[in-house]
Amino acid sequence: MDLGSMLYNSFNNITWSTTTLPLDRLISSYRLPQIVKLDSGESVEGLRENDYLLIHSCRQWTTITAHSLEEGHYVIGPKIEIPVHYEGQFKLLEQDRDIKEPVQYYNSVEEVAKAFPERVYVMEEISFNFKMASGESNEDTEVYNITLSTGDELTLMGQAELLYAKSSREKSRFNTIFKRIGKLNSISKLGRGKMPCLICMNHRTNESISLPFQCRGRFSTCSQLELQMQEGEHTIRTIVEKTRLPVNVMVPSSPPRNPHDLHLIREGHRYKLVNIQTKTVVVCCALRSNKILPVHFPLHVSTALPRLLVPEGLLQGESWFETVVHRWFTYCQEQFDIDDYSRAVRDVRVDWIEDGKSPKKSSAGGTGSGSAICNSSGSGSNGCPSHLHLPSSLSSARDELTQSFHRLSVCVYGNNLHGNSEVNLQGCVSLCGDCAPAEPPDADYLFPELQENSSGSLKSDVPYEELWLDHVKNAGPVLDHNEGVRGNSLSSGCTTALPYPKAGPTSALLSADVNLPPPPVPPKSEAVKEECRLLDAPPIPPRSSKQAGSSSATVPYPSAKPRQKDTRSPSPTLSYYSSGLHSIGGEGESQIESDDQNHACYPCSWIRPDASESSKPLPCLNPSVNASFSRLSWPNDFCGADSYKGEDFQSLHCRSYSSYPRKRTPGTPKACPSGLLDFDKRANFEGKAVSSKVQQVTQSAQFCTKSTSYNMDMCRDKPTDECITKQSQSCPILPPRTPKCTDAKKDAEAATTDTADADAVELESKSCSPDGPHPGTTDVFSVSHPVATGLSWQPPSNLSGISIEEISKSLRFIGLSEDVVSLFVQEKIDGNLLLQLTEEILSEDFKLSKLQVKKLMQFINGWRPKM
């Protein structure tokens, strides 16, 4: 008697329990290999009822789906799957895409943007750097470096305009003047420009990048590797790693034979490699008296896996049963090579593309079946109703090719192309998304811990990490609960699916599965991280913000937030990935103001949360407060409601991001309802008596939603340098706006009228300052108007020592427009600077017309208009 017959006779000594488990539950509960028996009534192709099965191992197979071709690139025959470690050689043919779209070459990013192909490849090393501006009104800059390596694959996503800081050569005329008088920092506004960029995804780094049109380098629509692959013969693994699928190949020579091949690849055959699939299979051996029949079961199929009888020796943890299993396993190892079995070429017998409706099945579901595809319902002539989906004609097969196949990117798989690697699924099948099978109709045994909470407690928008941790928390008590129910299930004859059975000494149920680490999250670029965070939380200012002396602390990320819906870029060519170029602080760099600030209205540090103070009449409030809020391009969802909580915000700094496109949520108020203006974080104006009319005007000015002139009257009692520092820390300077009235009388009437038109509100300095302006101090930021001082004002004959305020009066006096006055105020042009300006600077840098330049130059040279 041979060894196989002796081992087969040992089955007579095995007592079989009434416990039946589906295959996926079995492999997740017990250490492999194990011996089980096919349950009565189970219909599995290639197996007989009550066959003994040795569950050999779980393996991960990576295969390439291919179609047979005839001359002229027509698809014929069934689909096949070729393992990635197939030992045969292939030669690349002329590709369909190269015939339709010949290979193109480009010498700059601008040329790529004009043609805008789907993807390009970098043909040489490219390095480029430029200074990025943090915002239009922020003087901070940061150098942005771009490095591209040869062979990088870039998928084009869109275009955007980004703020950049101009180089010193572009403003050298200003530098010469400003260095001479020591005011080089006053030209920051003119050092900003908009740079068109091409938004791309670099597949090597898996990050989005913005390439300026100025960047030069060689690009191509075909990679160098793919061009080099046109010559010679290559393995299928080399082809899928270095070319884009689909690709046409030919078999140049007779390939090696595999005894387990179900499809014979012959010399001269042509194939179209269409996509790549990775799936997890359970390799088993049907144990018979005269032979061993290898079979495998894919875990990612829509049909139910077979139910198997479990022996009593496994449930009781008997050592003699473990010895029997070990002997059978050794015998099977001698009879067949599982690696050869895993490398076999097989026909795709089930149309997984149509069947894979869910993302889980379509992305990782695999395309292969094997010699054992089961269906417990037994419908169909062969027990596999899915086989009816086979393409029946050339047209249907050709239609399949028109579907959008997922192309293989080298950065996704890299060196992780599994050929037949063994994987351990103990305790992971019900947790890992890679291993969990799709739910069949009778899947009452799947995810028992979730069946109890079927009321929808598991939300689809729960973050990935929290979702995993939630599973881990629930795993322990669920297993304990199921152990207690096992006795009742056994006595009932096991008509329903059983929970995990109790593990004996040899069954080795993995109790450590509760502590399994979550599967790795795909890497995200910093731009994507910032964009995802900014959609759900208030933005964080640049790390280079000039906050001095404010207490800061790191803020943990909120656990859950309502998702902002339908947040899209207003421009179809503008991508959110362009936000990655801004100097955003990373995790741990976000700052929050001290507790004495009002969290109901971020971003400025002027407002106090004290309800008693906020309920008082506000003695002086400048309309520019709310104007600065309206200037911000951040979403206004977080400004204007007292019900918002402090923990909903991560940062309260005031910065302007003009290149962050956001859509306002409907119903969001634009106004900032309450708060005290207080630069020194103390109540400077408590106890000050103000008139009720000024209070009314101030309260109406609170809800100003348009830009008004920036006025620092409330800062007049402080030195000028301190005012400059405070202003630069708070909000960007807004251009001045003149009232619609033309005399002081109308201005006073407008100030005392309770009107809702906030654009016309200008508070006089005497009603805003509690102590009045100190003599000798000059407010270089407040831009007053001729009406404020009467019509008798005349510009001085000597302009060298006058202030910015007087320059503004002078410009209005000679009849220049408010746009010109605003530009001079923004650039802080005083008398000394005005005398240094030339016609070239006024026309080219200030963009003045010839008439304006002539009038201003005559004014500088001493001309005064007659009254």
Curated annotation (Swiss-Prot):
Residues bearing the modification Phosphotyrosine: 464
Composition bias, Basic and acidic residues: 740-749
Record key words, sorted: Mitogen, Phosphoprotein
Region spans: Disordered: 511-530, 536-594, 735-758
Keyword Phosphoprotein: yes
Gene Ontology terms, MF aspect: proline-rich region binding
Signal peptide as annotated in the record: none
Recorded superkingdom: Eukaryota
A Gene Ontology biological process term: epidermal growth factor receptor signaling pathway
Gene3D superfamilies: Transcription Factor, Ets-1 (1.10.150.50)
Annotated Pfam families: CABIT
Residue ranges with Polar residues bias: 544-554, 569-581
CDD domains (UniProt xref): SAM_GAREM
Region (CABIT): 12-322
SAM domain ranges (all copies): 802-867
Family matches, as SUPFAM superfamilies: SAM/Pointed domain
Family recorded in the similarity comment: Belongs to the GAREM family.
Job of this protein: Adapter protein that may provide a link between cell surface epidermal growth factor receptor and the MAPK/ERK signaling pathway. May promote cell proliferation.
Name by which UniProt lists this protein: GRB2-associated and regulator of MAPK protein 1
The species this protein was found in: Danio rerio (Zebrafish)
Higher taxonomy: Eukaryota, Metazoa, Chordata, Craniata, Vertebrata
Gene (UniProt): garem1
